[in-house]
Curated annotation (Swiss-Prot):
Molecular function GO labels: hormone activity
Pfam short name (any one): Somatostatin
Keywords, in A-Z order: Cleavage on pair of basic residues, Disulfide bond, Hormone, Secreted, Signal
Leader sequence segment: 1-23
Biased composition (Basic and acidic residues): 84-94
Protein name (Swiss-Prot/TrEMBL): Somatostatin-2
Amino acid sequence: MRLCELHCYLALLGLSLVLCGRCANSQLEPDLDFRHHRLLQRASATGQATQDFTKRDVEKLLSLLSIPEMEMREKGLSMAGESEDLRLEQERSAESSNQLPTRVRKEGCKNFYWKGFTSC
């Protein structure tokens, strides 16, 4: 009996998380939907919505619709690019600190290492 209740609670929790996630995604892009709606209103106001579209009109409409999406992608890519640049710079600085010039040591020189003596 308890196991069945637990399954029900977990199912409800999962369902609520999925629904909240979708609501959050829809709230993040209301501006994009608004732009699409405005573009379609302009098209219907000029009478293009009732006419047959030519290939050029369709291409122009699709390019106008994809502009906000491209801007969103570019923002994401620029942020990803900045983090990638930062990571590469950190790797380079770590590599440069590891590549210290080797010292020229005298023949037969010995250093004490915690496990024993080593040659220089």
